[in-house]
């Protein structure tokens, strides 16, 4: 699937028309395996209704395979030497490029796409980097340099290691207790399967050269690499054909655009991106979201396996739920016999490095002043966001910041009302039938920068609110009477059928069967 943003035009009961203009580079439709020049490749058009009903248009294109073959341009030794010399000259002229970046930041001319989503000094530096990189193929990005070093270490390790074996758990986000990776790792240990792990919250540009070498060697040796999020440096590699990669994506459903679905929405993503496209298999929470994951990861639909999401199994385990509730009440006695509001927003920004939340838009003081005394507020930041709001002294006994302390799934077991925005936590909340309030003060801005798979108003299983005063009133109303929840356009039953039909308490078991299947591939 190649995503196309289209405008819907319909007048006076006439047929709907979808108008769009897009340029598709056919040489990047396929990842590494290209068709033969004599083969024919059929392209067709499709669109998705809000109910996830896909319709395929009769119009299609039958094109020769040669149009899809990417021409590989490798530099000879003289061209490489010339690029190095030119890079040296450009470095001497670095003040010129930086001045050009300052002018671009001030809006006097366009900012280079390498600086998309950045501001201030960071935008100036990445603008200069982009200009020099375009001219020479080299730049000043620490991430690019260390990713290149990772690639060289991997290629060297592949020559040393004749045969792959075992499992590698790879992540650069915090591994939560009870999360996908944690549960599958426990099963691997129980079965006595050979595994290694490289788990860090440090992105590649902050890793030492020694750490990069260690990681590259582990990747080269692994028969199966298991992820639960995006690991960007992995996609710079041309993987060994016998290596399998399983993406256990951390989120359920399909809410915010992610991966390659953001083509045409975010400036820094181009069709030539290798991101995600090397996955052998990816988990999905329902058959209804398979096309979206296929599009987002740039992989065949057959590689998206709707076997469920392992971390959701606990929602079907009554004994576990009671055990966790009691453990949380023991650690946080203020929550016992209280009505708990969980505030769990997603991040703003373009990713891990730039993530933030505009806390000036959420007033803890105003909210707690109006809520009943027997209520408690828990703040749970997205893992990418480092800073949280200040908790007023008079409410520190009723407000807990557990952003770095607890698994968000576990917190849902003691939650009376969830306040969120565009976070995928809504899927788990629906499983537990928790009332949801969507505090979306920046909806239009968010849609312009990130966008969603569905129209928000037709999709959200809860009340949509845009200002703090209305949020306070709605939260107080739900604490007083949970049945007061406004009927959303899509009922929770419809929502669950569309996004969560593979979740039944046995996702971990099915995922382990897939792990063993991938390990056996090629044996």
Region spans (language model):
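Aromatic sugar-binding surface patches on proteins
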Residues: 16-32
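C-terminal amphipathic helix plus adjacent low-complexity
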Residues: 75-83, 89-112, 320, 468-523
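N-terminal pre-catalytic "stem/leader" segment of glycosyltransferase-like enzymes
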Residues: 82, 86-220, 224
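Active-site and donor-binding regions of nucleotide-sugar-utilizing enzymes
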Residues: 165-319
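Conserved catalytic-core segment of nucleotide-activated headgroup transferases in glycan assembly
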Residues: 176-187, 310-391, 465
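Donor nucleotide-activated moiety binding/catalytic core segment of transferases
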Residues: 209-224, 232, 378, 383-427
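A donor-sugar binding/catalytic signature common to diverse glycosyltransferases
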Residues: 225-254, 406-450
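Catalytic binding pocket for nucleotide-activated donors in carbohydrate/polymer assembly enzymes
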Residues: 392-395, 424-499
